[in-house]
Design a protein with these regions (language model features):
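Helix-terminus/linker motif at the lipid-water interface of multi-pass membrane proteins
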Residues: 28, 32-53, 122-129, 185-196, ...
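Small-residue hotspots at the loop-to-helix junctions and early N-terminal turns
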Residues: 49-60, 135, 139, 202, ...
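N-terminal transmembrane alpha-helices
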Residues: 7-47, 60-75, 79, 104-111, ...
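Transmembrane alpha-helix boundary and packing residues in multipass membrane permease domains
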Residues: 23, 27, 39, 78, ...
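Short alpha-helical transmembrane segments in multi-pass integral membrane proteins
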Residues: 1-20, 80-147, 193-248, 304-368, ...
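Short runs within selected transmembrane alpha-helices of multi-pass transporters and secretion channels
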Residues: 73, 142-160, 168-176, 201-216, ...
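Transmembrane helical elements of multi-pass membrane transporters/channels
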Residues: 18-37, 141, 175, 208-212, ...
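Small-residue-rich hydrophobic transmembrane alpha-helices
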Residues: 52-112, 149-168, 278-342, 372-386, ...
Length: 455
C-alpha cells in the first residue's frame, strides 16, 4: 500500500500504532544519553554527589543545543520535502547545503560559549567550588565538541525528508551504544584509559554523538541521491534561510522553553544543592517518560493533518480519540513505574544525600505525567488543525507562566522553614492540571470551528 493510501485508508488506530512505535523508540533513545551519564557518574567512588549536581546545572545548555539543532533540522526537513515534491532538485541541493552552513554557524556559537561563557553560566547556579569545577569541565567539553550533536540533528532530518528515517534510527542506536560502552571505561578508568571522572562522561557523550553524526553523513552522501551534494551549495541564501526558520523557529522556541524552565528551577533550588540535584535527576526520568508522549504526538499530528486536508471528519475524530487514549495508556504506565519503583531509580543514580529529595520529587511530580501527556497530545492535535497559537500558549503555561512563579512563591515558604521542600514539587501537578483544563477549552473551540463544520 502506498504511503498516501495508508494515510487515507488504513484504520486510524492501526495507523497510529504503526507510525507511533518507531517515533516513540526514536525519542526514547534521545533521552538515553543523559540517563546513562547520570547513572555512571552517580556511582563514582569520590565526588559523586557533586558530580550529579554539576550534571544538573549543565543540562539546560545541553537541551538548548539540541533545541537549536533539531529546530533547524525541522525547518530543513519540511522545506526539503516540499521542494523535492515540486521536483526542484537545484533548490533542494541549496536547502540541504544551507542547513549545513547553519550548522557551522551554530557550532561556532557553541564553541565560543564553551570557551568564554561556561564558567559564568555555572557560577550563576552554585557557590560550591567543586561543583563549579566539575560543571565547567563537563560543559566545556560538550560545547567545544558540539558539532556531533548539531550535525547529527541536521543529517537526521535530511534523511527523514527523503523517507529514509530507518537510517537515522540506526545512527541513534550506534551513538547510544558507543556512549554506554565508553562511559564506564572513561569515567572509572578501565584498561589503558585513565580515570577521568565527570570529564570522562562528557567525552563518552560527545564521542557517541560524533559517531552518530559521521554515520549519518555517510548515509546522507550515499543514499540521498535526489539532489546534488557539494560545498558550493553551502553558500548562504537569505531566502532559503528565512524559509527554514519560518518553519523551524517555533520548534526551537518550544524546546528552548524547557531549557529556561530547568535553569530557573535550578536558581530557585539554589538554596538546597541536594534538592537541586534531585530535581535534575528526576527531570531526566521525567523527560524519558514524556518523550514517549512526544513520539506519539509526532504520529498524531500528520495523521490528523492528512485527514484535515481530505476533509474527513470521521478520521479526524478517530485521530483525536485514539491519540488521547494511547497517550493516557503510556502515561499511566509511566506513573505506575515511577510510583512503584522510586527506590530503584534512586539506587541507579546512587543519589546519596539527595536520595530522600529524589524519591519525594518522583512520588509527587510523577502524578503530573497523565496531565502533561494529555497536554502534549493536545498540542499535536492543535498543530494538525492550524492551531499553532493554541499550542504555543500551552507551552508557555506549562513551562513559564504558571510553573515558575508558583515554584518561586512556594520556595519562599520553604526557605523560611514553614514547610518542607515537597511544596515546591507540587507546583508541577498544579501547573499541568491547570494547563490541561485550558487545553480542553482550546480543543472544544477548535473542534467546533474547524472539525464540526466539515461535511
Amino acid at each position: 500500500m502506498a504511503e498516501s493510501n495508508k494515510m487515507k485508508e488504513m484504520p486510524v488506530n492501526k495507523l497510529m500504532i504503526r507510525m507511533g512505535i518507531p517515533m516513540i523508540l526514536s525519542m526514547a533513545l534521545q533521552a538515553v544519553y543523559n540517563i546513562v551519564d547520570s547513572a555512571f557518574v552517580g556511582n563514582m567512588r569520590v565526588g559523586s554527589e557533586e558530580a550529579l549536581n554539576a550534571l544538573t546545572l549543565v543540562f539546560p545548555v545541553q537541551m538548548l543545543m539540541v533545541a537549536v539543532g533539531i529546530g533547524t533540522g525541522v525547518g530543513t526537513n519540511a522545506l526539503l520535502a516540499r521542494t523535492l515534491g515540486q521536483g526542484n532538485g537545484k533548490k533542494a541541493a541549496k536547502v540541504a547545503g544551507n542547513s549545513l552552513f547553519l550548522g557551522v554557524i551554530i557550532y561556532v556559537v557553541c564553541l565560543l560559549f564553551g570557551i568564554f561563557g561556561v564558567k559564568a553560566y555555572i557560577s550563576s547556579q552554585t557557590v560550591d567550588a567543586e561543583v563549579l569545577e566539575m560543571g565547567v569541565g563537563y560543559l566545556r567539553i560538550c560545547c567545544v565538541i558540539s558539532f556531533g550533536i548539531i550535525f547529527f540533528s541536521l543529517f537526521e532530518k535530511l534523511l527523514q525528508a527523503t523517507g529514509r528515517s530507518f537510517y537515522s534510527t540506526i545512527g541513534q542506536v550506534v551513538g547510544a551504544v558507543v556512549n554506554i560502552i565508553l562511559d564506564p571505561i572513561m569515567i572509572y578508568g578501565i584498561g589503558p584509559c585513565p580515570e577521568m571522572g565527570v570529564k570522562g562522561a562528557a567525552y563518552a557523550t560527545v564521542i557517541g554523538q560524533v559517531a552518530s553524526a559521521v554515520l549519518l553523513f555517510i548515509f546522507h552522501m550515499k543514499m540521498n541521491k535526489e539532489f546534488e551534494h557539494g560545498a558550493k551549495y553551502m553558500k548562504p541564501d537569505g531566502g532559503i534561510i528565512k524559509e527554514i526558520y519560518a518553519i523551524g523557529l517555533p520548534a526551537i522556541i518550544a524546546q528552548a522553553l524547557m531549557s529556561i524552565m530547568v535553569y530557573v528551577m535550578n536558581l530557585i533550588l539554589k538554596f538546597n544543592p541536594s534538592a537541586q540535584t534531585a530535581y535534575g535527576l528526576f527531570y531526566k526520568v521525567q523527560q524519558f517518560v514524556l518523550f514517549l508522549a512526544f513520539g506519539l504526538r509526532d504520529a498524531i499530528t500528520p495523521i490528523i493533518a492528512f485527514a484535515y486536508g481530505m476533509r474527513s471528519k470521521k478520521r479526524i475524530q478517530d485521530g483525536i480519540k485514539n491519540g488521547l487514549i494511547y497517550t493516557i495508556i503510556l502515561m499511566i504506565l509511566g506513573i505506575a513505574i515511577t510510583e512503584i519503583f522510586p527506590e530503584a531509580f534512586a539506587t541507579l543514580f546512587h543519589t546519596g544525600a539527595s536520595r530522600e529529595y529524589f524519591i519525594g520529587a518522583m512520588r509527587i511530580i510523577s502524578i503530573s505525567f497523565l496531565f502533561a501527556g494529555i497536554n502534549v497530545a493536545y498540542q499535536g492535535i492543535y498543530q494538525a488543525l492550524d492551531g499553532g497559537v493554541e499550542s504555543l500558549v500551552i507551552s508557555l503555561l506549562r513551562q513559564l507562566v504558571i510553573i515558575l512563579p508558583l515554584a518561586g512563591i512556594f520556595s519562599v515558604f520553604v526557605r523560611n522553614g514553614q514547610i518542607g521542600i515537597s511544596l515546591i514539587w507540587w507546583a508541577f501537578p498544579i501547573t499541568e492540571i491547570v494547563s490541561c483544563f485550558v487545553g480542553y477549552v482550546f480543543l472544544k473551540k477548535i473542534r467546533k470551528n474547524r472539525v464540526n463544520v466539515l461535511n
